[in-house]
Amino acid sequence: MIYRGRRMKIQNDIKLLLNPEIFSNLIKCVENAFPNEACGLIFGNILEVANEQKEEDYYYHYICRKFRCLSPDKSSSVSFLIQNEELLHDIIINETEVNPNNKEMRLIGIFHSHPKGTSPSFTDMDQMKYLDYFSSIEHDYGNKAFKNLIWVIMDAVNNDINGYIYFEREIQQVNILSRKN
């Protein structure tokens, strides 16, 4: 992918696996927010899968298990904003720790829509970098909750979807694959 004049690296070792039910929920979230940007959190597991072609090498499969559509603090057709860190923290704790069925899950992605296109905006890229930094400092909101998240961006018009991760100090595109439940 060429993005803003330079080629974006594709991270082939990381894949997001999305089942049809969650994909449908992403679309509903976008439809309900339109013409504004939709946003939400994706929870699931990260599986380390051995690379059979190369010894001591692994792939990382982000398996989507649950999607939570959120109402942004400020509605806009060009951005989404969630400022209430306590609410965000409570949602993450509830989805990953409180519910006994979710003990193995963690936050694996941040979802939002764009009115047109699936490329990250400059604001998206700044937020990816900030959340990576936020994961490295001491605070009350789960230090590693925002590390290595996949940002999933959906085109609000045609429902195309792309994923991105801030990894090895750069924004990289990840493949999103469909999977059965």
Predicted regions and their residues:
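Conserved beta-strand-loop surface patch within small alpha/beta domains used
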Residues: 2-107, 115-181
